[in-house]
Amino acid sequence: MRRLLLLLLAFAAALPAAAPAAPPDFVQAVEFPYYLYPQTLWERELVWLKTVGIRTVEFSIPWNWHQVDGGAEFDFTGATSPRRDLLGFIRLLRRLEMRAWIRPLPPVKGWLNNGYPPGVRQDRKAARPWLHELENLLAPQTEKHGGPIAFVEGSTGINPGFPDAPAPPLPVTVVSAHDPAAMTRSRQALATAAGALLWEDVEDALFPAGWERPGGPLYRAGAVSLNGDERPTVAALRRNAALLRHWGALLPGMKPERAYPVRLAAGKLPPGVTASELVSRAPGVASAVSIVNQSRQPFQHTLRAWDPFAKHSIEIENVHLAPHETLWLPVNVSLGGAGLCRECTAFSNAEHIVYATAELQTVEFENGTLAMEFSAPAPAEAVLQLARRPSGPYLAGGHLAEFDFDEKTLRVRLKIPQGKGPASQIRVALAIEAPEHSAFFEDAKRLIIGRANTVSTSYSSEQLADRSRLRLPEGFAATPTKKSPLGIDYAVDVPADALHGDWANLAIEADGVPLGRAHLQLFRPASVHLPDGIRLHFGATADLAVEPAIIPIDATAGRTVDVNIRNNSPEIQTYAIEPSGDGFQFLPPKSELNSGAVMDRVLELRIFPDGAAPGLHDWVLRFSGGTKLEIPARFLAIPRGQAVAWSADLDGDGSPEWILENQKVRAVFSAQDGGRWLEFTWKDSAPNGLNVLPESGAFAGTGAVEVHAGDGALEFTGKDWKRTVRLAGADASLAVEQNTPLPAETLETGKHNEITLQVSRESATHAAYALVK
């Protein structure tokens, strides 16, 4: 009994199961226009999408973005801008085993000239040379050739063979993550069991300077910020992604049940509540009831649906729905391999989930234990039809709980507690039988990239341990050491090029039968962050950490810099840290830092300028011991009482921004969009400075400008105009002067939290802007 409880605890506490090895047939994709994100964010955000359950990303390929300056040269490798590295992006998708849904032809949403190069007729037939260029590039990257490109949209009739990949399934339902009805609309699409579901506005978008549609936004907010923080609007995507991890493979084999509509057990559905049922074309696989409450009233009733396996109606008792809530309720879901659980071979054809009043996302069976994962916005229950008495015990949310078993009907009722988190997830596990043989992983949670990781396994008998083997992902290796008759430790080597945050699936097998599984996240040995680095702001609430970090420093007194170090390893680590950079002294010059397992530590470095001139200076942090890293960074030396003019590519689009900065404020300008003023930030406002400009900035125009830096000033030259911007050295006053009338802007004197913006327009060609605390 004790071993059975240990097996149950290990299985019930497991992380959510990985998606099936084969990609789901029902396509749920997220729009991911690579050119709208700094390249430094691609890996992080794609790993996040994969983690929540998204396997397909959709994106256009802007013709005028890759045909550099409208000439004959194309950039697909990032030679002119990191965001043009289309091949690198495709390779990243391939490494993550994700799929691409590409749109090779204009129009490109929100993009300059709809994506057409200047002077090219906006006609799809004119795009034949462009398609030919892409075909040569992308043909080896289709799924047919082992690549990630699964779908090509829009080339039919122009180059129908480009490249060798099908069009996405129709109809395509497009849902914005910002839509208050996103959950309802997405579930209505799933209830048809046809086509594809495409999510927009999931990620913050940042247009390269000068490439947004004239008058269009430079920054577009999504459900996930540029810093990786999830906003509440991501909840609908998360729930659908979790649902379709396994249901997605069943949907193409299902059809709407029209002969027996879903209704209440005692009457019609109330106004604002709709319900429909999907049933499997093959008997005894799975059915589901999709119910949507669009009313303002809570719903709590018993539903009557059709059981296609038994060929009679079935009552789903006590269904709870909050206002504007949806549920996907399982009905007659097989516990055998034809249902959601591909490896549940221990169940007969008669054993199935009769129904559940929470969303069933995952079913797993190993070591005699049946585990199910639900999305349960409210307390719920599941009813199982078995062919035997379950041995028990039952765990719900990691806690022992009672379950009801009817000896006559062999039915089990399981109480499901309300779930937690944005997707209301809860995991339950019921021991069905004491296994004849069992094997499991002992507290395995993470693997460190580039290291040999100890993974401990336990077995019910010495003979089973001797016959077992560890199944690993491609590129991994393992060396076993028998620590006891019933235990084996594996030294699992993770490839050095594995991606931080990705996942690896391990399994214990004996005689070809999987006995235990582990879904482990991959981590670098250590993560290093410099929180004092500047951020590029868009309005008052959005910002982007600049990479590599740029840290302002007093050119005389220096400053203290925090280095945040997270030990990702499950063991204590010691790090040797050595900063270096010409023109600066570092105290201490060398440091040794001990960090506990999975623990954050902060190292304080005191930096003293030693001959460094005003402006940008490179420096580097070198780590050895617990990890080997070189972290490049830059200092911005600012003399007291002076303003410094400097330039750097802050948003990773290949075009530098121009900055005026003193000890108090920072003003950022674009060399595109007529010298658009992007940011005016009071630097000492917590947590990352306060920008008083709107997301669209000010002085926006069209076209590139020439920029010259002087002593605390920037000079912008456009067609038939010249503008000079000066920042005072000692205070927060910015003066703007132009030889023609200044572009219209909407800035007004007013308070922004604790900072007041003062606006003074002396004439049509002169204006002054000051920040006062």
Predicted feature descriptions by range:
Residues 33, 40, 317, 518-520, ...:
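Acidic-aromatic substrate-binding/catalytic surfaces of carbohydrate-active enzymes
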Residues 184-238, 242, 288-290, 294-295:
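Aromatic/acidic polysaccharide-binding cleft in carbohydrate-active enzymes
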Residues 232-493, 497-566, 573, 586-587, ...:
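Non-catalytic C-terminal accessory domains or segments of carbohydrate-active enzymes
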Residues 91, 95-181, 197:
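Active-site region of glycoside hydrolase catalytic domains
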Residues 42-112:
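Aromatic-lined substrate-binding rim segments of carbohydrate-active enzymes
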Residues 27-39, 64-84, 120-129, 155-160, ...:
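The substrate-binding groove and active-site-proximal loops of carbohydrate-active enzymes
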Residues 141, 713-753, 773:
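Acidic, contiguous internal or C-terminal segments within carbohydrate-active enzymes
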Residues 18-56, 640-651:
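N-terminal carbohydrate-binding accessory modules
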